[in-house]
Amino acid sequence: ALVLRHFLPLLDKQGAMAMLSAKVGSIGDNHLGGWYAYRASKAALNMLIKTAAIELARSKPKARLLSLHPGTVISPLSQPFRGASAARPADLAAAEMLQVIDALGPEHSGSFHAYDGQALPW
């Protein structure tokens, strides 16, 4: 919330701002349970992004505020949970998310997308 408060006023009228969320923050895609605090924090972040995007559209209708899921990225945090999933290097995840940001227009402001551009359910 503090990042949005301080940086949204600086956003160009056609600019984009993306926040890192996670697929586990999706209520509609929760089929495994667990991770209560992490899921709740990412779901709250998604609500914050959606709400702020509505308000941003009033003053900067061509700007974009997005919630992005980077996928499983190789890191100490993901190490215990990777299992059979294919974790990707952080630089690849970042490059893919930049492509998603560039591909999404203002009509997608406030939306939740994965690194491959797939729209994710709230």
Where are these regions (language model features)?
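Conserved active-site helix of classical SDR/Rossmann-fold NAD(P)-dependent CH-OH oxidoreductases
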Residues: A1, A43-I54, D91-L98
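Short, conserved SAM-binding segment of the class I
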Residues: L2, H6
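Catalytic loop of short-chain dehydrogenase/reductase
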Residues: P9, K13-S59
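Conserved beta-loop-beta element that borders a ligand/cofactor-binding pocket
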Residues: L20, S59-G71
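Residue-level detector of flexible, active-site-proximal loop/helix-junction positions
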Residues: V24, T72, A119
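Short acidic/His/Gly/Ser-rich catalytic and metal-binding motifs that mark active-site loops
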Residues: I27-D29, I74-L77
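C-terminal helical subdomain
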Residues: A63, S67, S75, P80-W122
